[in-house]
Regions:
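Residue-level signature of transmembrane alpha-helical entry/exit and packing/kink sites
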Residues: 57-58, 102, 107, 149, ...
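C-terminal transmembrane helical bundles of large multi-pass transporters
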Residues: 440, 444-537, 548-552
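Conserved G/P- and acidic residue-centered "switch" motifs that form tight phosphate/ATP-binding loops
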Residues: 74, 97, 110, 122, ...
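Intracellular coupling helices
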Residues: 73-118, 178-190, 487-528
């Protein structure tokens, strides 16, 4: 059961969770021991709605912000270079009586026009590509289909343009309008050596954007390493050749559990009669269904029948399954037996546990024959009946691909919840049997309908889609940022060479070799690049823990990533 509530003023999610646990304990005492296996959990609605999309959205937002800052730093450096060539013009304006504010206003307005033109082009590109991007976005973001480039989006774009103009244009305009530029009237050569302060400013901007590029590339590298680890992950089942669907039926017509079980059996038998079908089973919640599922507490034999005992044990992922479900999903039996016709509503309550759960509850012991009480245990006189472990199966990724859980399976005829998802293993193309499956269901119950048809391979691909999308976006942003950094370094070196033309000529006249001159000019950009790399690596190391929750199978301080990114940028800088 799911309930939605609004927190009172001054209350926190933690306080609500504590109060909800107290209510659950009181209900347990009021109803004897029949609620022992029930658990109440509290989750912020935003976290529940965003689910797997949250890390992807955070990664994209962070990459977008970093790319904007890098672009601003690059543009500011280019404006400083451009402004250096206008020193004489600005000095003449001052000599003719122009005030500093007037010059700043003119230079800033030029930058504002450039930013607005870029903003219009960006909005136009977004408008043209918006539908294609939204339709192909694999992330399950709530209300994504209602997204549009409306007045709010245009206002946000305008604010970004104005903010960018301030960040990019204000400092260069103020810098070049200083009264000290009057000295430019005395410059007879455009190749005069630049002032040390202007050179330092340009170097700081280039080093700063290079540091931001390091952080962005580090994030992209960690995401790629995480995705690689996910691709190597053993999901615990074989998705190839498996068709999944839901069965909708009239609860008025199938108003008892016995009638519903009979319908499930008939549908599975109809599927098995198809020549292409290898195995067919059903389960309460199919693997990789996301955060939605059924959680349960557990008490094992030897522990007191109280909620305090359950709190010491892990929360389990509860499933109801038909006997052939494990064969249909190719979930391997490791020990004991699978469910069969013996496991009925009137027989001894039995369960199958995942391997990790068996090790957790009974370390270094044989779990077969052990007894527990979890959700679905029958109740006799308000006292739950022990459920006996008859089998141990391989762990399967039951909810999210990133998060392993402790799996508990009940026979579908002993479970309080009806199976919902049908899994059919086919020797050929799974979708090829859909018409025959629908015809078989219609022959059993004309009012029943087959919904949610998909292959398990598509389900697995959708589970990886958010990761794949994040990597593509962050990597694209990182590549653009790397291009910006390369342009910034090249501009710095070229401008430094232009400004030192007279010095270079003197050195050449005194016998300096070409390689000496090249080394002299290149050193200007090399030391700036090394400083930016050092700051970027240090910043990435400080911020590494902020992305830990978005990673899988890789440490936030991964040595390979922290070594490869500076090496790559060092090569680009050279």
């Amino acid at each position: 059961m799911y309930a939605i509530g609004r927190l009172a003023a001054g209350e926190t999610v933690e306080n609500a969770a504590e109060q909800l646990s107290t209510i659950a304990r009181n209900e347990e005492l009021k109803n004897g021991m029949s609620n022992t296996s029930m658990v109440a959990t509290t989750t912020p609605l935003m976290t529940h709605l965003l689910g797997a999309a949250r890390p992807a959205l955070l990664a994209i937002a962070g990459a977008s912000g970093a790319l904007l800052l890098i672009a601003c730093a690059n543009a500011a450096a280019l404006l400083l270079v451009h402004g250096a060539g206008r020193r004489r013009e600005i000095a003449v304006r001052f000599a003719l009586g122009a005030r500093r504010l007037q010059v700043v206003r003119q230079l800033f307005c030029e930058t504002m026009v450039l930013c607005l033109i870029a903003g219009v082009l960006g909005v136009g590109l977004a408008y043209v590509s918006f539908d294609a991007i939204v339709s192909r976005a694999p992330i399950a973001v709530p209300r994504l289909d209602q997204a549009a480039i409306d007045v709010r989006a245009l206002l946000f774009a305008l604010v970004v343009c104005l903010g960018t103009a301030v960040m990019v244009g204000l400092f260069p305009a103020w810098r070049h309008s200083g009264a000290a530029l009057l000295a430019g009237l005395h410059d007879r050569s455009r190749s005069a050596t630049p002032t040390s302060s202007s050179a330092r400013t340009r170097k700081l901007l280039v080093a700063g954007q290079l540091a931001a590029v390091v952080v962005l590339l580090m994030a992209a590298g960690l995401f790629i390493r995480s995705f690689t680890a996910l691709l190597r992950l053993d999901l615990g089942f074989d998705s190839r050749g498996v068709l999944t669907f839901n069965l909708g039926f009239s609860e008025d017509r199938h108003d008892t559990k016995e009638k519903q079980w009979a319908l499930v059996d008939a549908v599975l038998d109809s599927a098995r009669r198809l020549p292409e079908v290898v195995a067919a089973g059903a389960v309460y919640q199919r693997p990789l269904a996301g955060t939605i599922g059924w959680d349960t507490n557990v008490i094992i034999e030897g522990q007191p029948l109280a909620s305090e005992s359950a709190s010491r044990n892990p929360i389990l992922n509860w499933e109801a399954a038909t006997p052939d479900y494990f064969r249909a999903m190719d979930i391997r039996l490791l020990h004991g037996r699978l469910f069969d016709e013996r496991d009925t509503a009137k027989s001894l309550p039995v369960v199958i546990v995942g391997q990790s759960l068996a090790v957790r509850l009974w370390p270094r012991q044989d779990p077969l024959g052990r007894r527990m009480i979890a959700y679905g245990a029958p109740v006799a006189g308000n006292i739950p009946v022990w459920q006996t472990v008859v089998g141990v199966v391989e762990d399967a990724r039951s909810r999210e691909v990133e998060a392993p859980r402790f799996d508990l399976y009940l026979p579908y005829r002993q479970a309080p919840n009806q199976v919902q998802h049908f899994m059919v293993r086919v020797s050929g193309d799974p979708l090829a049997v859909v018409p025959a499956l629908k015809a078989g269901v219609a022959a059993i119950d004309p009012e029943a309908r087959v919904d949610g048809i998909s292959t398990m391979e598509d389900v697995v691909n959708r589970a990886f889609a958010a990761w794949r999308f994040s990597i593509i976006v962050v990597s694209a942003f990182a590549a653009i940022a790397l291009t910006f950094a390369a342009v910034g370094i090249a501009t710095l070196v070229a401008f430094a060479a232009t400004q030192r033309t007279r010095e270079i000529g003197v050195r050449a006249a005194l016998g300096a070799q070409r390689r000496d001159v090249v080394a002299l000019v290149a050193s200007e950009g090399t030391w700036t690049a090394l400083a930016g790399l050092a700051v970027g690596v240090l910043t990435a190391w400080i911020l590494r823990m902020s992305v830990e929750s978005m990673l899988f199978g890789v440490a936030p301080g991964d040595a390979l990533t922290f070594a490869a990114v500076p090496l790559l940028l060092g090569i680009v800088s050279v």
